[in-house]
């Protein structure tokens, strides 16, 4: 089964997936891609614009996970306005949801933060601090956390996620804050794979050339 992991970051969502799947990760920042590769040595890692990579390659995969950048959607945007900083919400989020819903024949999930505005497309589910849009059912999951994410140190975040970044990686706290909790990533993948196996034959959906 082939999985595409877009805007992969250092791979919080992917940490517990194991090695039974063929995973391709796409990350635009080289230093982040390097950290991901060191943590997930069996994955193919592509340094590229994930949004463009998606439209050019979506037919090669059985399952797609996309986590478009969240800052322009987050509630911090309203706080920044008090400092005279204004920004448009990045519509790539909704472009990908709509595109995948209408043109992708496998299973997909798009993840983002809970926004400061009413969502333009109704999400499938809210888990932890995130919303998820998918074309398969996702069952509820409660995430236990004994710290404030906004104030947590990189050490606390590293322990929570079970991710130890390579020593020379910069922006460790930021990268760890951006991670989807690994147990959430595994839960959603299991939902996607279970639904996929009921409805499709892996790696034949788009032809044998994959």
Protein language model regions, located:
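Generic enzyme active-site microenvironment
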Residues: 3, 25, 65, 109-110
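Short glycine-rich, polar/acidic loop-and-turn segments at beta strand-coil junctions
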Residues: 29-30, 68-70
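SAM cofactor-binding core of SAM-dependent methyltransferases
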Residues: 2-54
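Short N-terminal signal/transit or membrane-insertion segments
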Residues: 1-9, 84-91
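Solvent-exposed polar/charged
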Residues: 19, 38, 66, 99-102
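Short, charged low-complexity linear motifs
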Residues: 1-3, 21-22, 113-120
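Glycine-rich His-Gly loop
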Residues: 8-9, 66-68
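Class I S-adenosyl-L-methionine
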Residues: 53-63, 70-210
